[in-house]
């Protein structure tokens, strides 16, 4: 990528804050995230974060178990992202890193209501922007919410940090040993091949706004590495 990166948006899963032992929000993992956000900010890069809520509740997965409807399940998932966002915001503040916690749902006692204008201003002031509650509507995932925020905030790059794969493959590498990883792939090919690394709506939004997406392993690599090292993960862009 030849364009200088000045503003990025990270999409991380709620799972990245939890441990296999059952800690919903693990102190070590939270501290790591804060340190990495500081490192990116120290590179004079404006940083936004969209975080999932799967460490607390997985709306779709638990919809049938809890006998609740899809809308309620998705709304519960949105609230889970707010819980994670509050934890990250407090951890950043404890480390003297200025931030703005926003929500697409109105809950003024907990977070500022998300608006593109106020959020862009916070980024320009050097604050880490934390965007919670996804797109703010049921039936839309946090991937789509992240793509929406990236478009509204005119991010130079959307980075999806995953816990299970280190990029985009032609098929699931966890199931197929002969899966082939792409170093670079076009938006259109991701869509035409039905590669499920992100929602089709998220890919389409970024394609329309010409925002490249880098998919990388948050287990193997840091946030800073994902921005600057073009050999990490997979870049989804206009031309492969």
Curated annotation (Swiss-Prot):
Give the EC number(s) listed in the UniProt record.
2.7.4.22
Q: Which reaction does it catalyse?
A: UMP + ATP = UDP + ADP
GO terms, molecular function: ATP binding; UMP kinase activity
Keyword terms: ATP-binding, Cytoplasm, Kinase, Nucleotide-binding, Pyrimidine biosynthesis, Transferase
The record, for Pfam families, names: AA_kinase (PF00696)
Task: Report the sequence similarity comment from the record.
Answer: Belongs to the UMP kinase family.
**Name of the protein this chain belongs to:** Uridylate kinase
Q: Which organism is it from?
A: Chlamydia felis (strain Fe/C-56) (Chlamydophila felis)
Q: Which gene encodes it?
A: pyrH
């Amino acid at each position: 990528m030849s364009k200088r990166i000045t503003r990025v948006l990270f999409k991380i899963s709620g799972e990245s804050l939890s441990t296999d032992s059952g800690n919903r929000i693990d102190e070590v993992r939270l501290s790591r995230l804060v340190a990495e956000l500081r490192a990116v900010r120290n590179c004079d890069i404006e940083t936004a974060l969209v975080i999932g809520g799967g460490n607390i509740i997985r709306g779709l997965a638990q919809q049938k178990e809890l006998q609740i409807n899809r809308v309620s399940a998705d709304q519960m998932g949105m609230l889970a992202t707010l819980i994670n966002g509050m934890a990250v915001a407090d951890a950043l503040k404890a480390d003297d890193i200025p931030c703005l916690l926003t929500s697409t749902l109105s809950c003024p006692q907990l977070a500022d209501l998300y608006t593109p204008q106020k959020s862009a201003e916070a980024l320009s002031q050097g604050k880490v922007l934390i965007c919670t509650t996804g797109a703010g509507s049921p039936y839309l995932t946090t991937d789509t919410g992240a793509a929406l925020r990236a478009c509204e905030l005119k991010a130079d790059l959307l980075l999806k940090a995953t816990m299970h794969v280190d990029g985009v493959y032609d098929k699931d590498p966890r199931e197929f040993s002969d899966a082939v990883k792409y170093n670079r792939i076009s938006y259109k090919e991701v869509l035409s091949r039905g590669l499920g690394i992100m929602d089709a709506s998220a890919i389409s939004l970024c394609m329309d706004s010409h925002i490249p997406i880098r998919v990388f392993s948050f287990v193997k690599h840091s946030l800073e590495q994902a921005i600057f090292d073009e050999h990490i993960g997979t870049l989804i862009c206009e031309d492969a």
